Amino acid sequence: MDPNCSCATGDSCTCASSCKCKECKCTSCKKSCCSCCPAGCTKCAQGCICKGASDKCSCCA
């Protein structure tokens, strides 16, 4: 269980408007809250996809 998410590893959880799920292993958070988004990114919850380097993704590049 990730302290920032209310679900067990692999389950789904809600990460709607913030980037608090950076280390979350939930499958839904992986898609909706990218670990490569910079802190404070307002677009993190819009289904961005990480591209290579840890600081680049499709919505906050």
Curated annotation (Swiss-Prot):
Residues the entry annotates as binding a divalent metal cation 1: 5, 7, 21, 24
Keywords for this protein: Acetylation, Cadmium, Copper, Metal-binding, Metal-thiolate cluster, Zinc
Keyword check for Acetylation: yes
Binding site for a divalent metal cation 7: 50, 57, 59-60
Ranges for region Alpha: 30-61
Residues at which a divalent metal cation 3 binds: 15, 19, 24, 29
Binding site for a divalent metal cation 5: 34, 36-37, 50
Record-listed N-acetylmethionine modification sites: 1
Region described as Beta: spans on this chain: 1-29
InterPro entries hit by this protein: Metalthion_dom_sf, Metalthion_dom_sf_vert, Metalthion_vert, Metalthion_vert_metal_BS
Residues holding a divalent metal cation 2: 7, 13, 15, 26
Superkingdom of the organism of origin: Eukaryota
Keyword Zinc: yes
Binding site residues for a divalent metal cation 6: 37, 41, 44, 60
GO cellular component, one term: nucleus
PROSITE patterns from the UniProt entry: METALLOTHIONEIN_VRT
PANTHER family listed in its UniProt record: METALLOTHIONEIN, METALLOTHIONEIN-2B
Function summary: Metallothioneins have a high content of cysteine residues that bind various heavy metals; these proteins are transcriptionally regulated by both heavy metals and glucocorticoids.
Description of its domains: Class I metallothioneins contain 2 metal-binding domains: four divalent ions are chelated within cluster A of the alpha domain and are coordinated via cysteinyl thiolate bridges to 11 cysteine ligands. Cluster B, the corresponding region within the beta domain, can ligate three divalent ions to 9 cysteines.
Subunit structure: Monomer.
Record-stated family: Belongs to the metallothionein superfamily. Type 1 family.
Protein name: Metallothionein-2B
Organism per entry: Oryctolagus cuniculus
